[in-house]
């Protein structure tokens, strides 16, 4: 950090800036590039036209990026705040950062954390999440010690401290992610709590949460902004799970004239929700909305939406629910919002927003409110007579989902909702190269928003660059793979590249732990067998294709060898195993691996079916954890 910047800045201010930098630096690579700035302005929900935002970003990059490497380092970020403070551009930038949900108040007032730095957090989010979690876990005997929480106090930040609530919420969002037998529920010593928090964090990572900046100690301390950030990711994954065509074919009712199913499938859950709300608003004769913030502040669109989706009592066993529209004409916005929420309550959907959240247009909480409405009352009918190719709706394979969750857990941006469609401009792939220490020259990369004309050309250039990096600096085997294949969304060839990225990422972790010694399959297999042997275990593996792996006994034994005594062998079946036995062993093995601190992305089925690629990642993660033994 150069002297000039440091002399004018206090330690508290510096910590604050670090906090802000981390929030803008979505992929946590230590630099901010222009697409991250675009995201910041998008999330801050500022009433600026697109061209204005582009202008501001260009100016920030021009003034801030002093060494002209196409990205802003932390030093340059500090410089923007110190030197460019007075300019309108910097003021707008600071406003965007302060408005971004859950960000520290730069030069504002907020709760002081233990280190004396400022972290603000959204009281509205806390209130909303507490009510949602209270409802979700009200009948769970394992949570009686903390549920119900008081939404008006700091109960939430204490309640997540032992990891149980987090594990339960993860399972509600993606059922069966965590084997309940692996959650420590009794005699909660600090060590046992640490294990639960490991289990929660590594499982959150496996379902696609970005947890790079969150440690178990942050959760134990109940750091508000980190707790809320993690909970929002977990809750959102659950809310969005069914807003996806392959899991909900009735969404095809939202097809527009001349639109193909393939085009509809490329929409993100947020875009589909907006399309869904507008479908019902159109049927009610009300005007379209463009967002879940400014356009819903007067609650009028919500009144019409509720009236459209409320059950009309026409199906068998379905009671009719009438929405009272009289509050629509209320003159006061807050009273109108309250009246609307009372109607939502009739549908059992008074969740996530208070009248004030509606009137202020809180984008995050309104999105959650609408997603919950969709999940309870989609009010869509699958189109029967149209010429639709339903075979497209196969849904993603396990392998595709694992790759997607791995990418999202690393904080790539934009978020990957659809593996092939969302990689077609290669931006995500280029960010993954950075994660595996392959330098990317961002000045060569075309970034959104792409021009209307020639957009695909810009994306194709990125794809060509991604393949070029794979062949040369990364030394991947990419025979027969060209940029066009990524741009076309060719599944086999895209997967081939993505697997090599994930494999390299996994091996890099091992090499970092092993003082730079190269790691490969043979080294991992021999380490596994040596470790099992030294611990007096009778299991061993020949390779990652070894059929005996399907019992998961070698994995379970290895976990017990790494952390002696952690496996409860009463829960492990051996001898002649049924498919159910194998599945239960695998489920326990994956959760226990995560509990002792291995970030395993694979699924129990990968072990049962002995999928060599995923099996390799499991053993590599365990080897990494084993090498960390102090």
Curated annotation (Swiss-Prot):
Family matches, as Pfam families: CH, EF-hand_7
One Gene Ontology term of the molecular function aspect: calcium ion binding
Entry's transmembrane regions: none
Family matches, as SUPFAM superfamilies: Calponin-homology domain, CH-domain (SSF47576), EF-hand (SSF47473)
Residue ranges annotated for the Calponin-homology (CH) domain, each copy included: 123-239, 267-378, 397-506, 518-627
Sorted UniProt keywords: Actin-binding, Calcium, Cytoplasm, Metal-binding, Phosphoprotein, Repeat
Binding partners and assembly: Monomer.
Protein name: Plastin-3
Region (Actin-binding 1): 109-382
Gene: PLS3
Domain EF-hand: 12-47, 52-87
